């Protein structure tokens, strides 16, 4: 039998193929884990570990429309492809190698497609996904450089792989549904408990006059009060926007939401030593130019999240709402700075950061600070608990008595 990538006399090549497959598996497992952690967190104390900047971050991918297919995370298909490469290296055969070589082509095409989608549509790049891209392209190179010349795949193996892949996909789909259901049940109850365990904090000395929901003239008079420190170019803030947009409708007349500008850009924010989102300051100035137009501008920015990263789009936005002067208006700049600087009023919650408000989004819900975003189910559970508790909501240990199961009723 002729020497090839995984067959006789090619121990070194088999090792590299095994390494590529193992890398594909590792990157896929981490990607799947991040997908579920981002979309179905099980704690209020959750944080992303690979969001370095507006471009290099994983949350954009985790929240994207193609992050999963009917509940099956995209990373599962990479996991399965990597597993086949590893098995083909450990148990080599001509049929296995030909089939893997055939599949490597489609995997490489998929990788290129995902890379283009990520960079040019999402305008970001997931580091975990990038690891998979690198190992996949290495595997593709090895198969097409050293693989058997006769590359027609084994139909039998393809059929077996298809059945196994569908079986695994079904398992992930069921797991996805279980995680989704749990968000309204036991996980939500745990989050409510964690929420009440948080120490109370005061409201900022200056509450932004820019609100996305108003139930009363005085901020303190609504039963549900949310102050959100937000950056318009933060992927997690986009996720939060979608959750609050739905909840603001459901709790209309009972909720006040104040938008506390906190762009993570050194151009206008000196509270945190982060310069992650170029353009966030300009977007904040445009939105703060006219309180009467704030809500419309706020919604348009988030509804065009990817376009908002473009300087040209921001110029068009300012022109559309007559806010061209905002970028150089001293009064608007002073107002924005006054709002941003309230982030420095809170005691630090970590030795790593100087202040409590250090990232976006940061929420203050009825005088308790939550760092990071929360999904709809968790926010709804907290809101229901606050409404059911009334003035006693501030007492520790009340979450169990105030608990409301928010799961949709099954017919």
Regions found by a protein language model. Give the residues of each.
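Structural alpha/beta surface segment adjacent to cysteine/selenocysteine redox centers
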Residues: 227-232, 238-319, 353-355, 394-410
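Membrane-interfacial helix-loop segments of redox and metal-homeostasis proteins
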Residues: 2-177
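Membrane-interface segments at or immediately adjacent to transmembrane helices
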Residues: 175-221, 227
């Amino acid at each position: 039998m002729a020497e090839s990538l995984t067959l006789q006399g090619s121990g070194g090549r088999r090792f590299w193929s095994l390494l590529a497959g193992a890398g594909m598996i590792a990157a896929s497992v981490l990607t799947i884990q991040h997908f579920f952690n981002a979309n179905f967190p099980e704690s209020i104390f959750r944080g992303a570990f690979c969001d370095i900047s507006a471009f290099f971050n994983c949350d954009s991918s985790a929240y994207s429309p193609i992050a999963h297919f009917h509940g099956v995370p995209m990373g599962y298909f990479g996991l399965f492809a990597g597993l086949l490469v590893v098995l083909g290296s450990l148990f080599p055969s001509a049929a296995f190698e030909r089939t893997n070589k055939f599949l490597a082509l489609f995997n490489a095409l998929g990788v290129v497609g995902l890379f283009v989608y990520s960079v040019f549509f999402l305008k970001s790049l997931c580091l975990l996904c990038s690891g998979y891209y690198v190992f996949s392209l290495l595997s593709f190179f090895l198969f097409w450089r050293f693989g058997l010349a006769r590359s027609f795949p084994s139909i039998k193996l393809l059929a077996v792989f298809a059945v196994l892949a569908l079986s695994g996909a079904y398992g992930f789909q069921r797991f996805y549904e279980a995680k989704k259901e749990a968000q309204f049940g036991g996980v939500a109850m745990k989050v409510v408990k964690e929420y009440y365990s948080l120490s109370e904090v005061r409201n900022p000395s200056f509450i932004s006059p820019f609100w996305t929901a108003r139930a009363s003239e005085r901020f303190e008079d609504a039963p549900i009060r949310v102050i959100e420190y937000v950056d318009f170019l933060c992927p997690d803030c986009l996720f939060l926007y979608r959750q609050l947009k739905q909840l603001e409708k459901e709790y209309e007349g009972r909720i006040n939401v104040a938008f506390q500008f906190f762009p993570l850009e050194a151009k206008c924010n000196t509270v945190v030593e982060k310069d992650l989102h170029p353009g966030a300051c300009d977007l904040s100035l445009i939105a703060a130019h006219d309180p009467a137009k704030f809500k419309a501008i706020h919604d348009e920015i988030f509804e065009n999240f990817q376009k908002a990263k473009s300087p040209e789009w921001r110029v068009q936005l300012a022109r559309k709402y007559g806010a061209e002067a905002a970028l150089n208006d001293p009064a608007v700049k002073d107002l924005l700075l006054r709002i941003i600087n309230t982030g420095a009023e809170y005691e630090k919650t970590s030795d790593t950061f100087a202040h409590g408000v250090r990232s976006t989004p940061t929420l203050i819900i009825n005088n308790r600070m939550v760092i990071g975003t929360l999904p709809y189910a968790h926010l709804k559970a907290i809101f229901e608990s606050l409404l059911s508790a009334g003035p006693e909501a501030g007492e520790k240990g009340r979450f169990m008595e105030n608990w409301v199961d928010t799961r949709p009723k099954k017919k």
